[in-house]
Design a protein with these regions (language model features):
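Extreme N-terminal starter segment of soluble prokaryotic enzymes
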Residues: 1-3
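Short glycine-rich hinge loops at helix-strand junctions in the catalytic core
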Residues: 91, 126
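C-terminal "cap" of GNAT-fold acetyltransferases
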Residues: 108, 112-119, 123-125, 131-153
Length: 153
């Protein structure tokens, strides 16, 4: 697995890269309006700038995925991990989690409770559910999440 920092061109292309992944992942969970809102919030050039200004790191996973994370002091927060269908079933999540743990801290994430594929992946890779919470994403959208943690050994 090769994790590479995003180039400026990667940031310009991120929205288009993520759109089909999000339609597949959340199309049965969210309305089209909410999907467009969240895609713009997280993956538009302006949206990404907001997160980069807060210290979020963006990495390409080979040519099949995206990782977004940030150092939160006591732990590393994995904000986004998405793979194209081509990148699934090849062990990328475990390699990503190993990389994040190598930064020296526990890894914490939020997972949409309705995203069963992601929740099962995290559980299979040693994450535990610490709590449930409802996250206000804006625009009238509230997300039922699991807060999950993988401890650094």
């Amino acid at each position: 697995m090769c994790l590479t920092e995003f180039t400026e061109q990667d940031f310009l292309e991120l929205y288009q890269f993520m759109r089909p992944i999000w339609l597949e992942t959340y199309g049965h969970i969210l309305s089209a309006e909410h999907l467009d809102f969240l895609l713009t919030k997280y993956f538009s050039v302006d949206g990404v700038k907001t997160y980069r200004d807060k210290g979020y790191q963006y990495r390409k996973i080979d040519d099949v995925g995206v990782l977004v994370y940030v150092d939160r002091g006591e732990y590393t927060y994995m904000d986004k991990l998405y793979l194209t269908p081509n990148g699934r079933g090849k062990g990328y999540p475990k390699q990503v989690f190993d990389y994040l743990l190598s930064l020296g801290k526990d890894v914490v994430l939020n997972a949409n409770q309705k995203n069963e594929r992601a929740v099962q992946c995290y559980l299979k890779n040693g994450f535990v559910i610490e709590k449930e919470e409802v996250v206000d994403l804006g625009n009238g959208l509230f997300n039922p999440d699991y807060v999950m943690r993988k401890k650094r050994l």
